[in-house]
Amino acid sequence: MMIILNAPRFMTNTRLASTRRLASSLLSQASLRSRQLNPLFTSSYSTRSSSLKDRLAELIPEKQAEIKKFRAEHGQDVIGEVTINQMYGGARGVRSLIWEGSVLDPNEGIRFRGYTIPECQKLLPSSPNGKQPLPESLFWLLVTGEIPTLSQVQALSADWAARSQLPKFVEELIDRCPPTLHPMAQFSLAVTALEHDSAFAKAYERGMNKHDYWKYEYEDCMDLIAKTVPIAGRIYRNLYRDGVVAPIQMDKDHSYNFANVLGFANNEEFVELMRLYLTIHADHEGGNVSAHTGHLVGSALSSPFLSMAASLNGLAGPLHGLANQEVLNFLITMKKEIGDDLSEETIKSYLWKLLNSGRVVPGYGHAVLRKTDPRYTAQREFALEHLPKDPMFQLVSRLYEIVPGVLTEHGKTKNPYPNVDSHSGVLLQYYGLKEQSFYTVLFGVSRTLGVASQLIWDRALGLPIERPKSFSTEALKKMVETK
C-alpha cells in the first residue's frame, strides 16, 4: 500500500490545488510532444507509472529479489583484498561500498546507470528551447535506471517547485548568519534545520514498519532537493547582493529556478549552463567524501536532512570541494604573467617553471580516471558554442592542448589529462557569477541529487548500519608477524 503524506503545513489549499492541476496538465499534454522532441528515446524509456514514487514501488520488490538471489549464490565470493598501504592511504581502491547510481570507468569516465555523459546528453529530456539535459531527468535515471519521458520530468519539476518553500524559521536562520560565515557553513546549517519537518524522523518516532522506510525517506529526499534551491539563493543574495530572493516559479524547471533565485535567469545561456552543471556534478560513485558521508550517516537511520548536511560538511573540505577555485586562481595568476601570449613556447615555459618548483598543474589528473574527464569535455563543448572568443577560455583551451604532453614528459603523473574542475570556474566567471567562495554551494546543490537517490535505495534495500573493522598500528604489526 502506498503512503500518501499530507501536504507541507506551509502550503495553502489553493496553492496545492493549483500545483496538482499543473502537474496533471503537464502529464497529459506532454506525452506526444516528448517523443517528437526526443526521437532518440528507445525502449529504455520509463513507460509504466508516471509518478516517480509509484515507479519505485514497482521496482523495489524486483531489486530486492534480484539482490537476495545474487547474495544467496555469491555471498561468500571474494572480490578483492586490502593492503596495509590502502589502510593508511584513505582506503583508496578498496572494494567495499554499494552505490547504484553511477560507476566510474578509468577510461570512459562516469556512467550514470550505465549511460555515459554523451549518451545522457542525447537521451535525457531537455527544455523545449535548450540542448542540455534537465537535472530532473538525471535524477529519475539515477533512481530508476530508466530514461524518463518529458512529461514525467515536467511533473517532477512541478513537484519540486511545490515543495520548495522554506519554513520561516529557516529563512530567519540564514538571514541572521554573519556575512563572515562561509556559505557552505550556512548551507549545512540550513539543511540541518530542515530536520524539524522530517517525515522520516517523525514516522520513526511514532513507530513504522521497516518496509515503509523508503516511502518516508523518499518524501524527505524530495523536500531536500527542492529546498536546496531557495536555501542557496538566499545565501547568495544575502552575502553578495541586496538580500532580495526571487520567488520560485511553479511552471519552471529546477535549473531555471536555481538561476532565478541567484539573479541570473534573464540569461538563457546561464540557465543552460546550470542544467549542464547540475547534471554532470550530481554523482560520481559512492567512495568520494560527500557521497560516502551521506551514505554512512544515513546508515544510522539519520534523516536525509542530517545525512546531507554531513555530506555538505565533507564537501566543504578543501581537498574535495575547492578544486575548481584553485584552478581558477591558477589561471588568473598565469594570465597576469603571460598576458595574451598563448604560444606553445610561452605556455610550456610557464608550466615547466611551475613543475620544477615542486608544484602541480591544478585541474589535471584524477584518482581513478586515466583519460580526459568527460565532464570536462561537456563543459568544453558548451564553451566552444557559447564563448569561443573569451580570453580565459582560450587559455583553458591552449592548456588542454599543451599540458598533457608536458606532464607526460615530466613523468610523475598517471593521468596527464584535465578533470572536471579544470573548466567550471571559467564558465561561471564569464556569466558574472564571480564569487569563488560560493562555488562549492553550487556543487552541493548538484551533489544532493546523487546522494538523495542512493539514500532512497539504502532504505528500500534495508542496508544495515556501516561498521567496518579498524586496527591499531600495533595490531597490524602483530598480524604481519604471525604470517
UniProtKB/Swiss-Prot annotation:
Pathway it works in = Carbohydrate metabolism; tricarboxylic acid cycle; isocitrate from oxaloacetate: step 1/2
Which keywords does this chain's UniProt record carry? Mitochondrion, Transferase, Transit peptide, Tricarboxylic acid cycle
One of the protein's GO biological processes: tricarboxylic acid cycle
EC annotation from Swiss-Prot or TrEMBL = 2.3.3.16
GO MF, one term, reads: citrate (Si)-synthase activity
In chain numbering, the transit peptide falls at 1-16
Q: Please write the reaction equations for the catalytic activity of this protein.
A: oxaloacetate + acetyl-CoA + H2O = citrate + CoA + H(+)
Q: Report further notes.
A: Citrate synthase is found in nearly all cells capable of oxidative metabolism.
What is the protein name given in its UniProt record?
Probable citrate synthase, mitochondrial
What organism does the record attribute this protein to? Schizosaccharomyces pombe (strain 972 / ATCC 24843) (Fission yeast)
